[in-house]
């Protein structure tokens, strides 16, 4: 009787010791097991519940695949970032007007309202910068997870 890989059902001469299961489950190609682990993301054997000897690795950043699965969410994030950058640009371009306003302190109602609005815009700009930074970090962490792969080794 020939040995058959339990994943691909092809002939197999390898006996790999990935868990403590019986002999028939040790007959598996290393490539088949690698593919199965990366597809299923399981860290332990379904039968014996023994944890696999798995190492998580990442592709080089230059070879990352950028996955935009939910186009609606990505589009809304891009539009938000453009809005935030535009808002930040407008706020910083107004700074020269505020500097001249502060140097000639008139307590007119218009000046007080303008300063209040400008200070509010600065606070909103800071919040937008923090939020855009959080979006970028979230996007990069998600991309990092999608560009990871698992390698399995035999138990000793």
Curated annotation (Swiss-Prot):
It comes from Yaba monkey tumor virus (strain VR587) (YMTV). It is found in: Host membrane; Host Golgi apparatus, Host trans-Golgi network membrane; Host early endosome membrane. One of its GO terms (molecular function) is zinc ion binding. It catalyses: S-ubiquitinyl-[E2 ubiquitin-conjugating enzyme]-L-cysteine + [acceptor protein]-L-lysine = [E2 ubiquitin-conjugating enzyme]-L-cysteine + N(6)-ubiquitinyl-[acceptor protein]-L-lysine. Belongs to the poxviridae LAP protein family. Residues 95-116 are lumenal. Zn(2+) 1 binds at residues 5, 8, 29, 32. This is E3 ubiquitin-protein ligase LAP. The lineage of its organism: Viruses, Varidnaviria, Bamfordvirae, Nucleocytoviricota, Pokkesviricetes. Keywords: Host endosome, Host Golgi apparatus, Host membrane, Host-virus interaction, Inhibition of host adaptive immune response by virus, Inhibition of host MHC class I molecule presentation by virus, Membrane, Metal-binding, Modulation of host ubiquitin pathway by viral E3 ligase, Modulation of host ubiquitin pathway by virus, Transferase, Transmembrane, Transmembrane helix, Ubl conjugation pathway, Viral immunoevasion, Zinc, Zinc-finger. It holds the Pfam family RINGv. E3 ubiquitin-protein ligase which promotes ubiquitination and subsequent degradation of host MHC-I and CD4 molecules, presumably to prevent lysis of infected cells by cytotoxic T-lymphocytes and NK cell. Binds target molecules through transmembrane interaction. The result of this ubiquitination is the enhancement of the endocytosis of the target chain and the delivery to the lysosome, where it is proteolytically destroyed. A zinc finger (RING-CH-type) spans 1-55. GO terms for biological process: symbiont-mediated perturbation of host ubiquitin-like protein modification; symbiont-mediated suppression of host antigen processing and presentation of peptide antigen via MHC class I.
């Amino acid at each position: 009787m020939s040995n058959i890989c339990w994943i691909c059902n092809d002939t197999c001469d390898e006996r790999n010791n990935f868990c403590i299961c019986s002999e028939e489950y040790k007959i598996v190609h290393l490539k088949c097991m690698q593919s199965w682990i990366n597809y299923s993301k399981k860290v332990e054997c379904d039968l014996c519940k023994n944890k696999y000897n798995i190492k998580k690795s990442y592709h080089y950043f230059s070879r990352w695949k950028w996955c935009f699965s939910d186009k609606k969410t990505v589009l809304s994030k891009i539009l938000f970032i453009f809005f935030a950058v535009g808002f930040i640009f407008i706020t910083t371009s107004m700074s020269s007007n505020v500097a001249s306003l502060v140097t000639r302190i008139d307590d007119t109602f218009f000046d007080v309202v303008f300063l209040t609005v400008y200070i509010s815009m600065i606070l909103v700009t800071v919040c937008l910068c923090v939020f855009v930074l959080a979006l970028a970090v979230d996007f990069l962490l998600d991309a990092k997870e999608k560009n990871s792969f698992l390698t399995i080794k035999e138990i000793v």
